[in-house]
């Protein structure tokens, strides 16, 4: 295992539900490091770097990242993984909290870590949000998005 891979693996371990070492997580990043949660369209820096770690542990206290494949090329480490845990929520949504179901979830994810001088400079996380929501029993309300077509040229 190379040093950059070891750094990434150690960072993952700090974020597991049975560890929750937020200081260790933050210390894995450069001073100007950023965590981009691509699926949610959110970015975290500084003291907020641990926000998603805390959120995931609240959602799934037994959260664990099962690393399937790890590839390193220079200062880039790419990881294919499953984020696994038990949905003990609640899951906050714009419509209100979704109560926990106690179901086990296994969320396919791809993570890209860009390192500088032995620390994480940028972490881009691509979580399969649709699969996560489906496993939690949260389904899109397509009917509310469908609008009847009216006016000239409308199909009947």
Language-model features, listed with the residues they occupy:
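C-terminal and inter-domain tail/linker signature
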Residues: 1-156
